[in-house]
Amino acid sequence: MPNVESLNQHNKNYISDDAFEKEKRAHLEHNSDNFKFLYQEDIPHGDALDNHKLSYAVDIGSGTGWFANYLIEQRSYKKVYAIEPSSSAIEIAKKIYPDNKVKYINGFAEEEISKLKLSKPTFFSTMCCLAHLEDEDVLGILKTIDKIAPVDSVLACSEPWGDFYHRECWNIRPPEWWSDTLADWEFEFYNDYTLTDPPGRSKGFIAIKR
């Protein structure tokens, strides 16, 4: 069951009068900074993309489409699915990137991923969206990814990990919770970035389906 409070808070970012300009400006800043955003300590995506040359991707919680379009424009991906629950965010994405190279899907990942037909190794991405979902929903998403992902697919997550922690829309799970759920995947957990709230947790990991 989608977290309604989290969704409403998320959607507020995209319905304000200046939302389009804010998002467009943020995209330009990422681009002008030579895409260093993808190599921050808590974001494993840059490393994963450098080490695994794939051509297909599923961006979960794609927002206004910066990463999805980056994959096509900068990494020459052939097909990118961008799953986003906010229709307002998708509308902004289509205005920023009118070429329609990304396949946008308006809906919840736990419902939409199972509809995808993937035949080649795929790059799955999340950026701090699973942390806002309940364990049951995340389990559903992960098990569906496991079911449809071809061998050698990659899961790159800028998500917190560490001792269990649940507070309102902020959820953290330990490494074994992730690796037990995706038993056939090989995990690498990043510990360069340490959270301060709550303390003692880290953020970012990669998994490869074997």
Predicted regions and their residues:
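A conserved beta-strand element that flanks and buttresses the S-adenosyl-L-methionine
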Residues: 125
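Conserved acidic residues
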Residues: 55, 122
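Short catalytic micro-motifs in class I SAM-dependent methyltransferases
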Residues: 128-132
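Conserved helix-to-beta-strand junction in the class I
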Residues: 147-148
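Class I (Rossmann-like) S-adenosyl-L-methionine-dependent methyltransferase catalytic domain
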Residues: 1-54, 60-102, 106-116, 133-140, ...
